[in-house]
Amino acid sequence: MVEKTGAEYEIFAIRYAWRDARRSDHFIGGDPHEGPMPMDYFTWVIRGSGSEGGRTIVVDTGFTAEVSARRGRTHLRCPIETMSELGIDPDSVDDVVLTHLHYDHVGNFHKFAHARFHLQTREMGFVTGPYMRYPKFGHSFEVEDVVGMVKLNFKGRVEQHNGTFELAPNITLHHVGGHTPGLQIVRVMTRRGWVVLASDAAHYYEHLQKNRFFVQAFNLGDMVDGYRTCERLAASPDHIIPGHDPLVMKLYPAVSPELDGMIVRLDVPPKKAD
């Protein structure tokens, strides 16, 4: 267990969409136990407490209803509008972390009129470089999202990082790559210790626990090294939050009974899986 020191934060996961899928959709090489394996889509909110009270950082911004319909996803709610349930006004958010620029992590960015967007330099280079001519890589990006980031960069609102960056006291960004060249994860100190928002460094708990590879990958070596980085940075395996696993909504408590299935808290210990 890593010793707790300094600023602590609350963390919330907002479930905004889902899709029906099979196990073979999520593991390279298929799966001998083929069966249903739905995928949830999340954005995350980090909110300061104590000395960092009032500070809000958003991690990823989801996708729009229009993109959802075109890609065959079930859109439940706008994740940015849902933040009002936490008392968050997007216009008051100063910092948005984009773990990478896939369509389900960067859509709705335009709803943050004043924020700075934090991503890895390698991710910006990837989406504006030669690999986008290949459908295997390019299909997970929305061109208008990429163009939007380029325009914001010209306006001085994109902060590009090379590796580890301290965004705030006890909040750090860490480059891992793998899924995309510029994928980054977020390490946050909470009341229960260091929590790692793994995003797509680990789509499901099973990827991490069994060293399985997700089907969409740029570099498999970096992907499995990313699992080890998540483990090294988190206080325990229970402190790692995968990016798309429906188990997250079952393991962590809802903010309120009315928000069950919509928003859960990640800064408290999880329930034990059945």
What are these regions (language model features)?
Residues 2-4, 77-88, 92, 122-175, ...:
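Metallo-beta-lactamase
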Residues 10, 16-85, 185-199:
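Conserved beta-strand hairpin/beta-sheet module of binuclear metal-dependent hydrolase folds
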Residues 11, 46, 60, 93, ...:
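Divalent metal-coordination and catalytic microenvironments
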Residues 16-17, 61-64, 101, 122-123, ...:
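Active-site metal-binding loops of divalent metal-dependent hydrolases
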Residues 73, 77-81, 185, 189-274:
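Cap/insert and terminal regions of metallo-dependent hydrolase folds
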